[in-house]
Structure formats: C-alpha cells, structure tokens
Regions:
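Conserved hydrophobic beta-strand within the GNAT/NAT acetyltransferase core sheet
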Residues: 184, 217-221
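Conserved active-site alpha-helix within GNAT-family acetyltransferase domains
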Residues: 90-104, 200, 223-241
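Short amphipathic alpha-helix that is part of the acyltransferase structural core
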Residues: 1-22, 110-147
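Conserved donor-binding loop and adjoining core beta-sheet/short helix segment
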Residues: 4, 14-78, 172-182, 190-191
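Acyl-donor-binding surface of acyltransferase catalytic domains
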Residues: 34, 46-123, 244-247
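Conserved acetyl-CoA-binding loop-helix of GNAT-fold acetyltransferases
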Residues: 66-78, 189, 195-211, 229-234
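A conserved beta-strand-loop-helix scaffold within acyl/acetyltransferase catalytic domains
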Residues: 148-159, 163-190
C-alpha cells in the first residue's frame, strides 16, 4: 500500500468512469486530496480518495477496490479526519459498516443515471446561456440567481435555458466534467410553468450537448425525488446505480 498521485488514481478509476464518477470528480474539483492505493502484482487493485468538498471542512472518503482483499487495507488506512463516507459499491457496505461507526445521512441516497442518446423535443426552444444573458438571469427567480450563473460560467460550465418575456423560466447546466463524463445538473423550472415539459426539454438539450462533445451524460437524483427520476427516464437516461452517504462517528 502506498500514496498514489492523482494521475495514477485517475488511470485506475478510468476502468469504470461512470461508476467511479464521484471519485474522479473529487480528484478534479475537491481540496486537500489524499490518495492511497493497494498494489497487487505491480498494479493498483484498490484505491481510497479522501478530499474536502466545498463547504465542508472535514474529509469525505470514497473507496474503489477489485475485491474485499484490496478493500481491507484501505479501510485501515482511512484518515481519522474523514468524517463522511460515500459508498457506491453495494458489496462494500458490510465491510465499511462493520469497520466504522456510521450514521446514514438523511435523504443522502442518490440514484445515478447515464445515457448515450437522447430524443430532443420539438419545442420549446432551449439555448445556451452566455454572459450576455446575465441581466435576464439575475432578474429571474432562478435557484442560482445572478451570482450562481456567473460562478457557473467562470468554472466553464455550460448552462442552457428557456426564456420568455425577458425572463428565464427553466434551466439546466452541463457541469462537473471528467475526461469521460459530464453531469446534467441544476435542473429548475419556474413554479408557474411546471407541468409543461420544460424540465424534460432543458435536460434533453443539455445532455445532447454533452454527447456531442463525446462524453457520457450523467444525471443524479435523490432516491426520494421521483419527479426528477421521471424526467431522467423520459429524456432517455437509464438507471445505473445508487450511492449511500454516512457520517462517521469513529
């Protein structure tokens, strides 16, 4: 077992870029990153990625391993200040809950979807939003508001929206890119405009943009958010797997 570079870690995780998307994004976007690997036969057989997410001073730990023998030493090596553990492989759950005192985070379960093709609706018109739209976005009752929009552009994210009467009434963003995937996120529709297929339209357009740039489109929804899951399925996404998040007591 040894420390590995982010580049080594990325190459190992690339064997399953959809299943490992959260680990790959942690390597690219998080802070105070620690990577520990288990070597077998001269190659990595398991990996621990612990990092600070935005707005959280504690580390979040995630594991990927070929089998239980590779996972066991990574559990021992988990940093004591990793107070949050996210599990994306169901077979790891017993070993992790046995090794650590864990409390499930409320509403923490997420469903990951992926797609390689989408069907674009004929209407409404959805277009890429640019800095020229900043005033309209700021004047609209969006989830992110003007500052969130500018922050998204500064990070290289690609927002798409439906506009009417100089107001933004629906949007989604292509964000959190890895070399293989990109996520459709921040899906929002103005309350008075819901039930008209706008969410499906912005999700489909955003996913199509991701696919045109030769990445797999990812969509993440809370297990309890059935409406969001229906949008994903209607757009053409297929359920891939679930993740569970825990707070670590010891």
């Amino acid at each position: 077992m040894r420390h590995v570079t982010p580049e080594e870690a990325t190459r190992f995780l690339a064997a399953d870029p959809v299943g490992n998307v959260e680990l790959l994004c942690a390597l690219r976007y998080d802070h105070a990153i620690q990577c520990i690997g288990v070597v077998r036969g001269g190659a990595l057989a398991g990996e621990l990625v612990a990092a600070q997410e935005d707005g959280d001073n504690a580390l979040t730990a995630r594991f990927e391993a070929a089998d239980g023998a590779a996972l066991a030493p990574l559990i021992v090596a988990c940093p004591p200040d990793a107070r949050r553990i996210v599990v994306h492989r169901a077979w790891m759950l017993l070993a992790l809950t046995t090794a650590f005192s864990l409390i499930p985070e409320q509403r923490s379960e997420s469903v990951f979807f992926e797609t390689a093709a989408v069907a674009l609706p004929a209407s409404p018109t959805v277009r890429l939003l640019t800095i020229a739209d900043a005033a309209i976005v700021a004047a609209s009752a969006t989830m992110g508001g003007g500052k969130g929009f500018l922050d998204a552009l500064a990070q290289g994210f690609r927002p798409f929206g439906v506009l009417t009467d100089d107001r933004l009434i629906a949007h989604a963003i292509a964000a959190n890119a890895t070399d293989w995937t990109e996520e459709v996120m921040s899906v929002w529709t103005a309350p008075r405009m819901r039930g008209r297929g706008l969410a499906t339209a912005v999700v489909a357009t955003t996913a199509a943009d991701i696919l045109r740039r030769n990445r797999t489109a990812i969509y993440v929804a809370a297990v309890t958010n059935l409406a969001s899951q229906r949008v994903a399925v209607k757009t053409g996404f297929q359920r891939a797997y679930e993740t569970l998040a825990y707070r670590r007591l010891r």
